[in-house]
Regions:
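Phosphate- and other anionic-substrate recognition elements at nucleic-acid/protein interfaces
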Residues: 1-117
């Protein structure tokens, strides 16, 4: 990975995809629809991330993860418990979708889970 590595986290809810990108502190929200997932994937591809992390959310993460994978963006769907434990260890106990996206991006940077096809 390059010295200017870019990591993104996407917090997935039924209605929205909240995205956070490190280290540039870029954040945005898109609708959690097929079109919204493609827009997120296109925008992230332009940022050339080293890794994008999403939590498993009972299948709601699949459109976004699939859109990223189709574009060749390295993406990992992780167990929410792993991320929750990571957040606790870093003292980030606040709970909003935007903060969760930031924690996911930090998790991607610190842990660097391996992308799987």
């Amino acid at each position: 990975m390059s010295t200017n590595a870019v990591f993104a986290g996407i917090d997935v809810s039924k209605a929205h995809l909240d995205v956070a990108v490190r280290p540039d502190e870029i954040e945005w929200r898109s609708p959690n629809t097929d079109t919204g997932a493609r827009e997120v994937a296109d925008r992230l591809k332009d940022l050339d991330p080293d890794l994008v992390v999403l939590e498993a959310t009972g299948g709601m993460e699949i459109p976004a993860a699939s859109a990223l994978a189709v574009l060749g963006v390295p993406v990992v769907v992780v167990n929410p418990r792993q991320v929750r434990d990571f957040a606790k260890s870093t003292g980030r106990l606040a709970k909003t979708d935007a903060l969760d996206a930031r924690v996911l991006a930090h998790f991607a940077e610190a842990v660097r889970p391996e992308p799987r096809p």
